[in-house]
Amino acid sequence: MNYESALEYIHAVQWAGHKPGLSRTRTLLAALGDPHKKLRFVHVAGTNGKGSTAAMLASCLQAAGYRVGLYTSPFINRFNERIQVNGEQISDDALVRLVEQVQPAADAMQDVPTEFEIITALGMLWFAETKCDIVVLEVGLGGTLDSTNVIDPPECAVITALGMDHVKELGPTLADIASAKAGIIKPGSPVVSYGGVPEADAVIARTAAERHAPLTVVDLSRLTIEDGDLDAVTFDFDGLNGIRLPLIGSYQPRNAATAITALRVLRSRGWNIPDSAIRAGLEQVRWPGRFELLRHSPVFLLDGSHNAHGMRATVQSLRDRFPGQKFVFLLSIMADKDVDEMLALLLPLAGQFVTVAAHTPRAMSAETLAEQIRARGGRAEPASTIEAGVARAVALGGTGPVCALGTLYFSGDVREAFAKLNQ
């Protein structure tokens, strides 16, 4: 088996026809020696901000001197990004070796595991093999029935900002979504919640009380944003002052406040995490594809906001960083998202749209998306490929700002096309 065939094997099994549940993951991990039982975790769920918060947690724990695993999805440029230890992606050779280990166990199962379940098993094997002190584990979808939820009670569960997304899988109300996310709360294990949505907060508080899990809600009244530019946003939170965060979205200090709150909970449980490590970890964190500046002048931004809740935060960041300016938007949206609300948020800031389809069957076609924009009074033209779309958006932008957004699934392709254009 080589790297390409290993990836082919991983991607061969999709969700279709599989009943949600943890039994397949448990069976697979048991056949592999239950590597997850040797590990300690911070488990992160939420609608938006969970990847950024997970990256911040991992960076701070590493700065405190721990060996830290980080498990996230989706990837931006290469699959290996999803499984990292101390900021280093799993090597191609190690990935191939672990797929060769997982394949016979997976193939022997009557109810074969899904792609995400196989990747979760690969992550657990790698984190155990590399002797991680702690793993920051990002949920794939929901919480209760997500394959990451096979773990024993974590050192801390973290629930980031909640909003309406994945309603088909999780349910049509915020209470349903909160209930799925609250599934990661384990008996006696502390939980940190971003809060701010009463309907969801009530569900999380009730679940935490039922499971005797100490709950801390992030106190955003202690957050002050001092300054923000195209290099960093400076903020104070709960006694930590003047932190320069290189993730420049206006919403990122709120994610940082969530991470700091969780790190202090870990500290109360005996983890040695001084404030100096929290500061260092936040000031050197990297998390591609989230309000990321690929070029300062003229501005070219890349953002992975993929639902109305995330788009609202991105639009606020655009208003904060570029007051009064109009953008050329390079846009791709999944057909199962709230296209109406996403377009309503973007149209007031748009001079022009260039639409593309990300390389996934869920993507709305470039033509359909352009028609939807025109029907709402916007100017839009479809591009046949992402490469053509990037070139066209840059040409239309001239000296003005361009922002590529709508899904994480095209971030890697946009970055590659933009780099090629600027060679």
Q: What is the predicted role of each segment?
A:
Residues F127-D133, R269, D320-Q325, A393-P401:
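Glycine-rich phosphate-binding loop signature in dinucleotide/nucleotide-binding domains
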Residues Y194-T216, L230-T234, V299-L302, A308, ...:
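C-terminal helical cap/extension that packs against the catalytic core
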Residues H18, L22, R26-K38, A63-D152, ...:
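ATP-dependent carboxylate-amine ligase catalytic core
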Residues V44, S52-G69:
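A conserved segment at the C-terminal end of the G1
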Residues M1-A16:
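Charged, amphipathic alpha-helical linker segments immediately N-terminal to NTP-binding catalytic cores
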